[in-house]
Amino acid sequence: MDSLKIGNITLPHRAVFGPMAGFTDAPCRRLMAQHGAGFTVSEMVSSRALVYHDHKTVSLLKAEPNGAPYGVQIFGEVPQIMGEAAAAIEEYQFGFLDINMG
């Protein structure tokens, strides 16, 4: 299978494991990476909850050292809040940020 390049990340193949709220938690991402997912993405995370440091939401960001690039998906409706959430996520140094566009 051909590799896939997204920005400065090169994935070994085009098989990826996308974000699913309530499903793609840390153990699930670890399992998918072990079975060859080119990258994994967090559950969908509320930008507003991140900005307000909601404990449950922040816990969704737990990274697993599984070798596959790991990204975070955020959603929201207020551009300023989305920007603040993206800045907050930057400190975690994930491979990429995915914005859910509806």
Q: Can you name each region flagged by the protein language model?
A:
Residues D2-K5, M20-G95:
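Glycine-rich, positively charged N-terminal anion/phosphate-binding segment
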Residues T10-A15, A68-G71:
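Short beta-strand/loop segments at the ligand-binding rim of alpha/beta enzyme cores
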